[in-house]
Design a protein with these regions (language model features):
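GST superfamily/GST-like fold recognition
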Residues: 107-110, 151-171
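Single conserved hydrophobic/aromatic residue that forms the stacking wall/gate
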Residues: 172-182
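Hydrophobic alpha-helical bundle segments that form small-molecule/ligand-binding pockets
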Residues: 139-153
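GST-like domain detector, emphasizing the conserved glutathione-binding G-site
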Residues: 1-129, 133-136
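Hydrophobic transmembrane-helix microenvironments that flank and shape a buried ionizable site
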Residues: 61, 98, 157, 175-176
Length: 182
């Protein structure tokens, strides 16, 4: 059985979402967002930097949400959540699958750092405002592309899990920024 190590409100949500879509049985171990949870020697044996998500699938232990999702699709996709490489949808699937980590998550990470992770005295309003502006610019093409569509490539795919989860994370990221009047 697959074991998913996660901390709530992290990229591990993408992996859990895909596992649910694929109807794969899995076990969850929730690690607290603390030094004892993520930086423990036990967890660092799974991920040297003490990050999540990590899955264990038999002898395989793999981290990074995109890599995990690709692995799960290649091994277990029985729902067609990844188009065939020869299909006309495939290039767009790849584009949107990777867009979230390349364009959406970098400014979101800065917003989280500036509103949640850093102590108040180390936060920089200029960095926060720049990140908010970049995030808006990064989301505009997504909004435009999805106009009149339900999904990124016609039917629901793993690209929707990747990018959709990033958009879901905006709910708590935006709340943190709103609390600071950004």
């Amino acid at each position: 059985m697959i074991k998913l190590y996660l901390t709530p409100n992290t990229r591990a949500g993408r992996v859990a979402w895909l596992l649910e879509e694929l109807k794969i049985e899995y076990e969850v171990e929730i690690l607290p967002f603390t030094k004892e949870g993520l930086k423990s020697p036990e967890h660092r044996s799974r991920h040297a930097l003490g990050r999540v998500p990590v899955i264990e699938d038999g002898d395989v232990s793999i981290f990074e949400s995109g890599a995990i999702i690709q692995y799960l699709l290649d091994k277990y996709d029985n729902k067609g959540l990844k188009p065939n490489a020869e299909s006309k949808e495939y290039p767009y699937y790849l584009q949107w699958f990777h867009y979230c980590e390349g364009m959406v998550m970098p400014p979101m990470n800065q917003i989280v750092v500036q509103t949640i992770l850093l102590p108040e005295e180390r936060r920089d309003e200029t960095v926060l405002k720049q990140a908010m502006n970049l995030l808006t610019k990064s989301l505009n093409p997504v909004n435009d592309y999805l106009e009149g569509k339900d999904y990124l490539i016609g039917n629901f795919s793993a690209a929707d899990c990747m990018l959709g989860h990033s958009c879901y994370c905006l709910l708590y990221t935006s709340d943190a920024a709103d609390d600071r009047n950004c």
